[in-house]
Amino acid sequence: MTGMQHGLFSPPAPAGLAEKVEALRATIRRYDYEYYVLNAPSVPDSEYDRVFRELKALEDAHPELVTPDSPTQRVGGAAMAELMPVRHHVPMLSIETETDTTPQGAYNFDARVRKKLGLLPEDGPIEYAAELKFDGLAMSLRYEHGLLVQAATRGDGEVGEDVTHNIRTMRQIPLQLHGEAPEVLEVRGEVYMSRPDFERYNARQREHGKPTLVNPRNGAAGSIRQLDPRLAAQRPLSFFAYGLGETKGWQVPLTHAQVLDALKALGLPVCNERAVGMGAEALAAFHQAISAKRDQLPYDIDGVVYKVNRLDLQRELGFRSREPNWAVAHKFPAQEEMTVLEHIDVQVGRTGAITPVARLKPVFVGGVTVTNATLHNQDEIDRKDVRIGDTVVVRRAGDVIPEVVSVIKERRPAGSQPYILLDAIGGLCPVCGSHAVRLPEEAAVRCTGGLFCAAQRKQAILHFASRRAMDIEGLGEKLVDQLVDQNMVETLADLYDPGKINLETLSGLDRMAMKSAQNLLDALQKSKQATLNRFIYALGIRNVGEATAKDLARHFGRLDALQAADVDTLQQVPDVGPVVARSIAEFFAEEHNREVIRKLRDAGIHWSETDGQPASSSKLEGKTFVLTGTLPTMSRDEAKEKIEAAGGKVSGSVSKKTSYVVAGSDAGSKLAKAQELGLAILDEEGLLSLLAE
């Protein structure tokens, strides 16, 4: 047995080592609680990794000290032969769904509850708890004396499946509860996959040529039902607790809201998007508020849930057909529906990209009737195997362009053929007849016609005139169509040519009276006072968005310096890689583009130029801001411009890396999260003072 260091023959652990190991476990549990529950980590990831490695090394050297609840034991168990059935001690009941998806649904639920309790109008409102209805997989976690002993799916409500081996791989879920734990505590909640995690996972899978997940919900459900926990551990899963099952040896709080607070104190993640309010008005307001911010949430929901807050009233209300009378799910209009893809058309964008567009049998989804959906490009068509005549699932979320997310292949008509975009258009641009090509490194098929192509010309003008570019008010799509179709505007510079664009020529167009024509001329004159970054963005250089345009303007300071820069010089600009650098260099290498720029400047477009300076000298360099609510005297776009002009960055979400949150009136969850994280919060006056320093 010489040299044996592990297993039954390990030497006894030195005195005090067991205490050190347990202290390391407690430290890791605290770090997990701060990161996953409080969303306020106290140490960087590197320190967490260091402590974890130290614990792992000690346990490897002294396996007799390993315990089932150790953080090192989350991953690595053997694969299961099958998922075993589990009978729930307290049934996992489903919740009735309110059929009215408008705010009226809240009033319907309140009326039923009041009737069941025998309340009269003069008896006053009922207190309710309102929370989100997550689109994931319902889960029951059983803790005994503070240790996680079992995790089970809902199944039919009476019997689920044992998935403990997979749940243990989730760092969000504590293997040991914090503080004084009950004898038995069953926690009910939802396993889900956030949208950012879903996108990152699929991007990695595509990069390695592996299968991708269809949607976050399927990803969560499929991951939890894996037989091999090592596979589940590779999936980025999350969990929210929202209720109780069996409890023993625990003083259950008096209200549902207090239950959630108690679960959070025990170390379980609880969603902060919840509220307590009086009466149906509060529920309807919650439904409307969450509906408005639904698409900004990092996870999928399909509605909200209302519960009578007092647990004694819940017991009095009881159940009906295995559904509680004291709760209801109030859904939003569906964001995904099935319909038939009747045809595929193509559109030509300002960069020449020829995009396939699905023409659909009209379907009501996401609150509107949808007849078109983007198919993105040939790669996406191939990946989803989309064909004309297919029954497809269409998704529309908020203002996002509807897209075809999947195909119901069981309903595919006989004789359907794969769709090849280049073949469908005969290898030619459908607008100008120029050759269409697909470069090896690109997903898009492109027209080679440039500004000879009317479609590219129209889109280039609309982009040039857009609010974040030259901001030419009144130059909309219908007017641009006329200007291009009647050959009044062939290049961007023609917009400022008084021989082509004047009162006489404009007033002769459809729906352009003298006043409208004069307003447009005034807007064109006003747009001549520009900024360098807006002008760069307005030129429509491929791969150059607002942020890159600002970086270029800040770095070079002068347009002629930017025009003279080669690919290597351009790559010295922050966040400009070889692809973007090549796009910029190729754009300015074209004599036609340089001529248009000369004419634009000759027409009077100007800005203040500097010699350029490193961004590090900017007063807000390295600072990240988040804007929320309504500011008294300026729009969010104006505030964003001021911050970025001073070298700061503006983000759409609050995190521990946020430097300042600028809050106006009616600030929402971003302000609450900032307060929870202890971040610096400014009003408009505070922001202006900071900018003036």
Curated annotation (Swiss-Prot):
UniProt KW keywords: DNA damage, DNA repair, DNA replication, Ligase, Magnesium, Manganese, Metal-binding, NAD, Zinc
Protein residues bound to NAD(+): 45-49, 94-95, 131, 154, 190, 307, 331
Keyword Zinc: yes
SMART domains on file: BRCT (SM00292), HhH1 (SM00278), LIGANc (SM00532)
Requisite cofactors: Mg(2+); Mn(2+)
Entry-linked PROSITE patterns: BRCT, DNA_LIGASE_N1, DNA_LIGASE_N2
PANTHER family per the UniProt record, alphabetical: CHROMOSOME TRANSMISSION FIDELITY FACTOR 18, REPLICATION FACTOR C SUBUNIT 1
Function as written in the Swiss-Prot or TrEMBL entry: DNA ligase that catalyzes the formation of phosphodiester linkages between 5'-phosphoryl and 3'-hydroxyl groups in double-stranded DNA using NAD as a coenzyme and as the energy source for the reaction. It is essential for DNA replication and repair of damaged DNA.
Name of protein: DNA ligase
Originating organism: Methylobacillus flagellatus (strain ATCC 51484 / DSM 6875 / VKM B-1610 / KT)
Organism placement in taxonomy: Bacteria, Pseudomonadati, Pseudomonadota, Betaproteobacteria, Nitrosomonadales
Gene symbol of the encoding locus: ligA
